[in-house]
From Swiss-Prot:
Predominant subcellular localization, coarse grouping: membrane
GO terms, molecular function: UDP-N-acetyl-D-glucosamine:N-acetylmuramoyl-L-alanyl-D-glutamyl-meso-2,6-diaminopimelyl-D-alanyl-D-alanine-diphosphoundecaprenol 4-beta-N-acetylglucosaminlytransferase activity; undecaprenyldiphospho-muramoylpentapeptide beta-N-acetylglucosaminyltransferase activity
Membrane topology: Peripheral membrane protein
Assigned protein family: Belongs to the glycosyltransferase 28 family. MurG subfamily.
Gene this chain is encoded by: murG
Protein name: UDP-N-acetylglucosamine--N-acetylmuramyl-(pentapeptide) pyrophosphoryl-undecaprenol N-acetylglucosamine transferase
Catalytic activity: di-trans,octa-cis-undecaprenyl diphospho-N-acetyl-alpha-D-muramoyl-L-alanyl-D-glutamyl-meso-2,6-diaminopimeloyl-D-alanyl-D-alanine + UDP-N-acetyl-alpha-D-glucosamine = di-trans,octa-cis-undecaprenyl diphospho-[N-acetyl-alpha-D-glucosaminyl-(1->4)]-N-acetyl-alpha-D-muramoyl-L-alanyl-D-glutamyl-meso-2,6-diaminopimeloyl-D-alanyl-D-alanine + UDP + H(+)
InterPro entries in alphabetical order: GlcNAc_MurG (IPR006009), Glyco_trans_28_C (IPR007235), GlycoTrans_28_N (IPR004276)
Length: 362
């Protein structure tokens, strides 16, 4: 019997499919020092670059292709990548013999989950968004359990072993350091407006920031992705990426945040009680960010502007209204907190430890 505790995590494509897994791993590492952690993802990918920063997680590259809902010539080649990914995952699992495989989303997560099913290895897939993406729909047919971030997602997984766990957030968000944002903004006394383009960067938000930063009396923090260079100007700081400690401080202590509406970002904003204006990503997506935002809008927990209707004047007016209307500001901040499950990382980690116990006892 394999008594060494090993767990494979898999997921990627964006930071929103990686950071929740890291949050779970951090909690597991804190609770049990005798677990080996592995991450299966694509070489040179977002997940590869992020996992490299965590020396206690072994990264193993697997091939995978994107499964599209629309016609594309790439579908013909990507289906073979998925098959190769399943085959490689099969032999990796046989070699390392993990007791559990945990998927955090993205197309790279499907081959390991399918391979785990073939080898009768316990597997769990976690859907971060309100409604499941294609990868999770596939994973749910093979996984032992399904974890969901929104209670409302239960309806998509009828006759399945589904558990509402919330979405794990990075440990740095539990106690943000106010000194960090003070240093980043050079101790500004102006309102702080932070604009995030997501882990891949968003051209529309980058252009928006450059167009409005000199039209509002505020300090702008701009996370731009890799398509722009980092810079610091008067009342403006731009960086391609901020580390977890910086992001936690920026989100907690900014007056207003303007962002895409990925599920991971929403949960981090909720943990901080942030005042957020969402500009959901629509083009080329399944509309998950629109639906993520809709459920917050219904609870008066955010403001939203559709990208197709986005204009400088509209966003400027919205920012000015928030900065001058304390009642509205407070309502938005208080209502978004309702979407934060404080014990999510701890809950999932303890569930996994119980799974280890059950597996080793059988």
């Amino acid at each position: 019997m394999n008594t060494k505790k090993r767990i494979f995590f898999t997921g990627g494509g964006t930071g929103g499919h990686v950071f929740p897994g890291i949050a779970i791993i951090s909690k597991l590492k804190e609770l049990d020092t005798n677990i080996e952690f592995f991450w299966l993802g694509q070489k040179g990918s977002m997940e590869d670059n992020i996992i490299k920063e965590h020396e206690y997680i072994k990264f193993i590259a697997i091939p995978s292709g994107k499964l599209r809902r629309y016609f594309s010539l790439q579908n013909f080649t990507d289906v073979f990548k998925v098959i190769f990914g399943i085959i490689k995952s099969f032999f990796i699992i046989k070699k390392y013999k993990p007791q559990i495989i945990y998927a955090t989303g993205g197309f790279v997560s499907s081959p390991p989950i399918i391979a785990a099913s073939l080898l009768r290895v316990k597997s769990i897939t976690h859907e971060m968004d309100l409604d499941p993406g294609l990868a999770t729909k596939i994973n749910s047919k093979f996984a032992s359990k399904i974890h969901i971030s929104f209670k409302e997602s239960t309806k998509y997984f009828k006759n399945k072993n589904v558990l509402y766990t919330g979405s794990p957030i990075r440990k740095e968000f539990s106690n943000p350091n106010p000194n960090i944002i003070t240093e980043l903004t050079q101790n500004t006394k102006k309102p702080i407006i932070s604009i995030f383009g997501g882990s891949l960067g968003a051209e529309v938000l980058n252009k928006l920031t450059l167009n409005i930063k000199n039209k509002i009396d505020a300090y702008f923090i701009h996370q731009c992705g890799k398509n722009l260079d980092a810079t610091r100007e008067n009342n403006y700081l731009r960086s391609q990426f901020f580390n977890a400690e910086e992001m936690a401080s920026i989100i907690k202590f900014s007056n207003i945040i303007i962002s895409r509406a990925g599920a991971g970002a929403i949960k981090e904003f909720a943990s901080a009680g942030a005042c957020v204006i969402f500009i959901p990503f629509v083009k080329g997506s399944r509309g998950d960010q629109v639906r993520n935002t809709k459920i917050l809008e219904e609870q008066n927990a955010c403001l939203k502007i559709d990208e197709e209707n986005l204009s400088e004047s509209q966003i400027i007016d919205m920012i000015k209204e928030i900065l001058t209307n304390k009642e509205k500001f407070d309502i938005l901040k208080n209502n978004i907190k309702k979407f934060h499950n404080q014990d999510s990382s701890n809950l999932i980690a303890n569930l996994l430890l119980k799974d280890f116990e059950d597996i080793n006892a059988s």
